[in-house]
Amino acid sequence: MGASGSKKLSKHSRGLRERLLRARGDGYGKQRDASGGEYSQFQEESGREQNSPSCEGQQYQQGEYMNSPWRNPATERQKDLYRQQNMDDVDSDDDDLIGVPVTPRVPRREMTYKLAIDMSHFIKEKGGLQGMFYSRRRHRILDIYLEKEEGIIPDWQNYTHGPGVRYPMYFGWLWKLVSVELSQEAEEDEANCLVHPAQTSRHDDEHGETLVWQFDSMLAYNYKAFTLYPEEFGHKSGLPEKEWKAKLKARGIPYSE
């Protein structure tokens, strides 16, 4: 993308971050990954990603994004304000929630490998998804935002079935979903905020897992979804129909006859 494109993205990114913040609330204590390791807000993982080999997208100027509780420590008052804002947004209409035009600003287009990588790095630079709890509502926010602001047809954001790590099925999208367990501290802190995605994520997921987005630069080179779970691609897998259907059935994944 050229300079003009990056300016356009920088301007409109603020809208996406604000809407995600409103649906997010704030960071809550520590999380535990599926293996039992404890960490806070994925900050350590985020730092490692900076030094890992990657298919770098467009570089963006730092300091353009608003302060957020997962980048800067929030005061107790800020935490309370974020929580209340999240509560107030629960019954909001999607159009009001997203704050984007009814029709796309640019011609509609399909997602491409390069576009997926550029969008992934752009969102990472703005801190928009890292360590954020996944929910169907946030899934919609991301779909609708990219459709209205970038013209991207919302048929690309799919993840492997699970349980465990959910890999993006669109090659080039560098955000996977990782299963985490909330610490006791976080569970108690969220007891009075049951509509927060940390609580609703497990209900959205058929495996009952709490999921967060995590950036993985190696997904630009390694098509993990297809390598590990080709049966989820059905006829596109290259497997005999009988074989991929049998694998889906064994994993309890429904499919159309």
Curated annotation (Swiss-Prot):
Gene3D superfamilies: Nef Regulatory Factor. GO terms for molecular function: GTP binding. It comes from the Viruses. Residues 1-72 are annotated as: Disordered. InterPro entries: HIV-1_Nef_core_sf, HIV_Nef. Residues 15-35 have a biased composition (Basic and acidic residues). Homodimer. Interacts with host CD247/TCRZ; this interaction induces down-regulation of cell surface TCR/CD3 complexes. Residues 140-156 are annotated as: Mediates dimerization. It is found in: Host cell membrane. A lipid is attached at G2 (N-myristoyl glycine). Belongs to the lentivirus primate group Nef protein family. This is Protein Nef. It is a lipid-anchor. GO terms for cellular component: host cell plasma membrane; membrane. Residues 38-65 have a biased composition (Polar residues). Keywords: AIDS, Host cell membrane, Host membrane, Host-virus interaction, Lipoprotein, Membrane, Myristate, Viral immunoevasion, Virulence. This isolate is from a German AIDS patient (with predominantly neurological complications) who was probably infected in Mali. Signal peptide: none annotated. It comes from Human immunodeficiency virus type 2 subtype A (isolate BEN). Factor of infectivity and pathogenicity, required for optimal virus replication. Alters numerous pathways of T-lymphocyte function and down-regulates immunity surface molecules in order to evade host defense and increase viral infectivity. Alters the functionality of other immunity cells, like dendritic cells, monocytes/macrophages and NK cells. One of the earliest and most abundantly expressed viral proteins.
